[in-house]
């Protein structure tokens, strides 16, 4: 089974995370960052993963450390769960509407971490959540999972809807990229490795 667990304890956060690629969209998420909890639920459901997260952090300061460290743990668990990457599709993309917002995510599980993000959120906060943390989370996810991740929010007026579309598209794109294609022999690269 393609799954992995991660634990990370620092002076700022305490995180336990379990991730399964070939899941059923089951999420058991407990964080002290409610908006991130909501986004991880959406990501899990739309990616058909199984994800358990128990995360506590110094949110009396702000949500930065908790959000960043969840991204680190999820990226590491995703990379480990992929294993040797034999037979995966490698590439995935999704275009997802959420009411008036439209987001697109494209991913390459290339072992070359990069984040390219084009999103102009109209509001700096959704509730108490700083919207700049979306970039922070995605960058740490891409870095630790060693993926090339492109995120474009084409348009939208409601910041919540725009971010929600991103997380749904992220789940769907990663589901596609991590899927096993029986036609693929070895890893999908002319180099013979990823």
UniProtKB/Swiss-Prot annotation:
InterPro entries: IGPD_sf, ImidazoleglycerolP_deHydtase, ImidazoleglycerP_deHydtase_CS, Ribosomal_Su5_D2-typ_SF. Coiled coil: none annotated. GO terms for biological process: L-histidine biosynthetic process. CDD domains: IGPD. It catalyses: D-erythro-1-(imidazol-4-yl)glycerol 3-phosphate = 3-(imidazol-4-yl)-2-oxopropyl phosphate + H2O. Pfam families: IGPD. One of its GO terms (molecular function) is imidazoleglycerol-phosphate dehydratase activity. Its EC number is 4.2.1.19. One of its GO terms (cellular component) is cytoplasm. It is an enzyme of class 4 (lyase). Pathway: Amino-acid biosynthesis; L-histidine biosynthesis; L-histidine from 5-phospho-alpha-D-ribose 1-diphosphate: step 6/9. It is found in: Cytoplasm. Keywords: Amino-acid biosynthesis, Cytoplasm, Histidine biosynthesis, Lyase. Belongs to the imidazoleglycerol-phosphate dehydratase family. HAMAP family: HisB (MF_00076). This is Imidazoleglycerol-phosphate dehydratase.
């Amino acid at each position: 089974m393609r799954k992995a667990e991660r634990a990370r304890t620092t002076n700022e956060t305490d995180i336990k995370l379990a991730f399964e690629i070939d899941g059923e969209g089951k999420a058991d998420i407990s964080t002290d960052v409610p908006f991130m909890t909501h986004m991880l639920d959406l990501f899990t459901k739309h990616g058909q993963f199984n994800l358990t997260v128990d995360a506590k952090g110094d949110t009396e300061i702000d949500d930065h450390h908790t959000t960043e460290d969840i991204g680190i743990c999820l990226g590491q668990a995703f990379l480990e769960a992929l294993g040797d990457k034999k037979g995966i599709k490698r590439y995935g993309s999704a275009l997802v509407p959420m009411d008036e917002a439209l987001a697109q995510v494209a991913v390459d599980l290339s072992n070359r971490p990069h984040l390219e993000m084009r999103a102009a959120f109209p509001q700096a906060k959704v509730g108490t959540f700083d919207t700049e943390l979306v970039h922070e989370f995605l960058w740490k996810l891409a870095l630790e999972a060693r993926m090339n991740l492109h995120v474009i929010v084409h348009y939208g007026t409601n910041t919540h809807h725009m971010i929600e579309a991103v997380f749904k598209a992220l789940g769907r794109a990663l589901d596609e990229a991590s899927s096993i294609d029986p036609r693929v022999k070895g890893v999908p690269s002319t180099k013979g490795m990823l």
